[in-house]
Amino acid sequence: MNEKDNQTTSEPENEQEIIDVNDSGEQPEENETEQPQEEAVENDEIAKLQQEKDETYNRLVRLQAEFDNYKRRTLKEREADRKYKSQDLITELLPAIDNFERALQVEVTEENKSIIDGIMMVYRQLQEALTSQGVEPIKTEGEVFDPNLHHAVMQIEDENMDSNTVVEELQKGYQLKDRVIRPAMVKVNK
């Protein structure tokens, strides 16, 4: 009997061992339900961080584009300032040049020859200075009237001339490089 008692007592131990194995098998099921919840929370955090990263990147790209546009714009403005820096001074000098041209239209006599020669030298120096800065007179007589370059003061009818043609220049116009600083005052054929 002792052997039977030993056998019966050993059986429950095996059952407990089996139960223990089953008990340990149930715990992973609880962990499995916790893991998807943790993964869902982690995925939400990852999605939020990804969205923040994308927004920050887009903001950075926009700021970089704005900065590049700013650099280009300021460079163009500096170039324009450099190109036309002398425009104000030239505009102030044009009436003096007009007066020199009127003085040179006076009839030369023995008495005023030296004065006219002096005026001519100063006038040439002024013209050279203007040319060195990129100032050119606007072509007028015989040219087709261009409202961007010419200011029509008078109109005449001449059958020998083409219509809309500049007949006479009344006051010289000037351009600084590609910009008109004073349009030419002209008489135009109808």
UniProtKB/Swiss-Prot annotation:
Alphabetical list of Gene3D superfamilies matching this protein: 3.90.20.20, Head domain of nucleotide exchange factor GrpE
Biological process, per Gene Ontology: protein folding
One Pfam family from the record: GrpE
Keywords, ordered alphabetically: Chaperone, Cytoplasm, Stress response
GO cellular component: cytoplasm
Claim: Kinase is one of the keywords in the record: no
Compartments it resides in: Cytoplasm
InterPro entries linked to this entry: GrpE, GrpE_coiled_coil, GrpE_head
An example Gene Ontology molecular-function term: protein-folding chaperone binding
Signal peptide feature range: none
Quaternary structure and interacting proteins, as annotated: Homodimer.
Function: Participates actively in the response to hyperosmotic and heat shock by preventing the aggregation of stress-denatured proteins, in association with DnaK and GrpE. It is the nucleotide exchange factor for DnaK and may function as a thermosensor. Unfolded proteins bind initially to DnaJ; upon interaction with the DnaJ-bound protein, DnaK hydrolyzes its bound ATP, resulting in the formation of a stable complex. GrpE releases ADP from DnaK; ATP binding to DnaK triggers the release of the substrate protein, thus completing the reaction cycle.
Family statement drawn from the similarity comment of this UniProt entry: Belongs to the GrpE family.
Protein name per Swiss-Prot or TrEMBL: Protein GrpE
Species this chain originates from: Oceanobacillus iheyensis (strain DSM 14371 / CIP 107618 / JCM 11309 / KCTC 3954 / HTE831)
